[in-house]
């Protein structure tokens, strides 16, 4: 369920703003989105795994807060990220 280091590096390379960027909202949202997608696949198979479902809800809430922050901070970056990730909003 956890992301491999290689996959995390790929996501960081794809969404980074500058050379040493690992913590910008875009990178954090992209990593959370990947984790959420993986957990969704897990929960489709294991429907009664309520502990993982709670973790999923926490991740979705954290991503929502980061998206709200980015929307308030820079709407252009927000719209670009939404289109790249294919999120509804």
Curated annotation (Swiss-Prot):
GO BP terms, alphabetized: translation
InterPro entries the UniProt entry points to: Ribosomal_uS15 (IPR000589), Ribosomal_uS15_bac-type (IPR005290), uS15_NS1_RNA-bd_sf (IPR009068)
NCBIfam families: S15_bact
Assembly and oligomerization: Part of the 30S ribosomal subunit. Forms a bridge to the 50S subunit in the 70S ribosome, contacting the 23S rRNA.
Native source species: Geobacillus sp. (strain WCH70)
Protein name: Small ribosomal subunit protein uS15
Molecular function in Gene Ontology: rRNA binding; structural constituent of ribosome
GO cellular component: cytosolic small ribosomal subunit
Family in the record: Belongs to the universal ribosomal protein uS15 family.
SMART domains for the chain: Ribosomal_S15 (SM01387)
Residues spanning the membrane: none
Keyword field: Ribonucleoprotein, Ribosomal protein, RNA-binding, rRNA-binding
Role played: One of the primary rRNA binding proteins, it binds directly to 16S rRNA where it helps nucleate assembly of the platform of the 30S subunit by binding and bridging several RNA helices of the 16S rRNA. Forms an intersubunit bridge (bridge B4) with the 23S rRNA of the 50S subunit in the ribosome.
